[in-house]
Design a protein with these regions (language model features):
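Glycine-rich, charged/polar anion/phosphate-binding loops
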Residues: 232-233
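Beta-rich carbohydrate-recognition and catalytic domains
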Residues: 1-119, 123-173, 180-228, 241-250
């Protein structure tokens, strides 16, 4: 999860606090005033017995929509390797993201799926209204699913996006955001592709199009975000001014 808040960039990353192998997935935390000099903090979200903390995002809920008062709200995939199950859960922080409280009603979104992950949340403000939008993936089915919420806890399915021309592979880490192109607002949808021939293994693609608050419509074929190998799992910071978009990937 990446968020810019009160003049600081906060980077939350998947981390095994007990070793260098994949496992015990938790969220580590580092912060920076300039994206160059970083300060490490204690583990932000530790894994539980049957719930590892997979990728997600963070937003500043200044109006207290979620019922936690003004707070940073983190969205993450709760992963159970025992049950092979993935659902979306939330936690909140009142101390600039240093410590977090798990929401007692977790998970907030469950599709009874083993491959439903990587929630990225943004605030949509447009002709359709003013509400929160979540992008997530059904990774093996190669679909981005879009949900809306007024309170960050109860989510309603809006639409799904697929692109058969991408070919084989799994989809991960979607990121939907507006961007001004030649003076006009467009919407960009970024998707990481794993084990995908079209990117030579692992890489990132993006679509440019429109989003009416419900449905994303691509205006053409996908493009490569980076022509090097293994640019993967990148997401952009929330909390930056609308005209700014900064992304960090593996």
């Amino acid at each position: 999860g990446l968020v810019f808040h009160d003049g600081e960039y906060h980077l939350y990353y998947q981390y095994n606090p007990e070793g260098s192998d994949h496992g015990n997935m938790s969220w580590g935390h580092a912060s920076s005033p300039d994206l160059v000099t970083w300060r490490e903090h204690p583990v932000a979200l530790p894994y539980a017995d049957d719930a590892e903390i997979y990728s997600g995002s963070i937003v500043w809920d200044g109006d207290g929509d979620a019922g936690f008062g003004p707070a940073l709200v983190a969205f993450y995939t709760a992963h159970s390797s025992v049950r092979r199950h993935q659902a979306q859960a939330i936690a909140y922080s009142h101390d600039e993201g240093l410590t977090w409280t798990q929401y007692e009603g977790n998970p907030v979104l469950d599709r009874d799926s083993g491959d439903f992950r990587d929630p990225k949340v943004l605030r949509y403000r447009g002709p359709a209204g003013d509400y929160w939008v979540m992008s997530a993936v059904e990774a093996v089915q190669q679909r981005v699913v879009f949900y809306r919420s007024d309170n960050l806890r109860d989510w309603e399915l809006l639409s799904e996006f697929a692109a058969p021309q991408v070919g084989d592979g799994i989809w991960e880490c979607p990121d939907l955001f507006p961007l001004v192109v030649d003076g006009a607002q467009k919407w960009v949808l970024i998707i990481s592709l794993g084990m995908a021939p079209v990117v030579g293994g692992f890489g990132t693609i993006y679509f440019v199009g429109s989003f009416d608050g419900t449905t994303f419509v691509a205006e053409g074929d996908f493009r490569l975000l980076d022509h090097g190998r293994d640019n993967y799992a990148g997401v952009s910071f929330s909390g930056l001014p609308d005209e700014d978009r900064t992304l960090i990937a593996w």
